[in-house]
Amino acid sequence: MIDRLVDAGAPVHTCCRLLGVSRQGYYRYRKRPTSATELRRRWLTGLIREIHIASRGTYGYRRIHAELTIGMNIPCSNRLVSVLMTRAGIGGLPGPVRIKRLKGVATADDLVNRKFHRLALNELWVTDITEHPTREGKVYCAAVLDACSRKIIGWAIDSKQDSTLVVNALDMAIRARQPAPGGVVHADHGVQFTSWVFTQKIRSAGLLPSFGTVGDGLDNAMMESFWSSMQIELLNRKKWKTRVELTNAIFEYIEVFYNRRRRHSSLEYATPHDYDLARTARTLTTTGSKRPRVGVSYTHLTLPTTPYV
């Protein structure tokens, strides 16, 4: 405490008097050699700063702890990471505000019923559209997410939201995955998703269309969660000048950061890409209802070449 006050410019004698400490005792304390525990904490604080920078300033203490213990094999506790971050003035971005939504009216079959958990790839894909303004006008992004690995497997960006936008995102996912028949593609009741061309694209790939309740975002909560993360970690962090600038940033966020570097709490802090690879290679072990661990080496978070902001 006194050290921090003195470093901030406060007189030593004033700090000692206010805190009831003798100046002689304080100076004896200052002359003591730094303990091994304190040296380790300083070292960990430096690593925490590097990880926080590499995450574009988005990681809180849980993901930083995962990066230290899983990515770097450094044993430490969640609490220690939280304490060191607080002392160093490092913090993650605040989470989304949870809003209770009113129940809407169902107008089409919902094959998911808010049960998004899947243990195999390509059993369930969820898709949706988000928008964000630039000085040139809005940018619309459609994405397709695999419910098992949380990986974005298809996406498309345009200056208008129409059926072509969502079909392009779905087409990218189908070409990348070549799914077996019987998988489900789940969306909301936007006109782009209920259009003939989109539902026909689903059926022609041997997949089944599914639509949540009208007006209830919880029926597509997994996709809403991804959009919320992207809003907090990318879109809302600056004012975007051009559509090209924002398009490039979304591309980097999805393909470089989210899929390959960002650790996901529901995947036991694996990245979607690593979890996807492990599922494909069938190197997972399942224990009861607990989500299985990834049996491949984790990708270590590296410093970004281009910051988002």
Residue locations for each model-derived region?
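Mobile-element integrase/transposase regions
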Residues: 74, 82, 86-143, 164-169, ...
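C-terminal domain-tail junction helix/linker
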Residues: 46, 203-205, 229-301
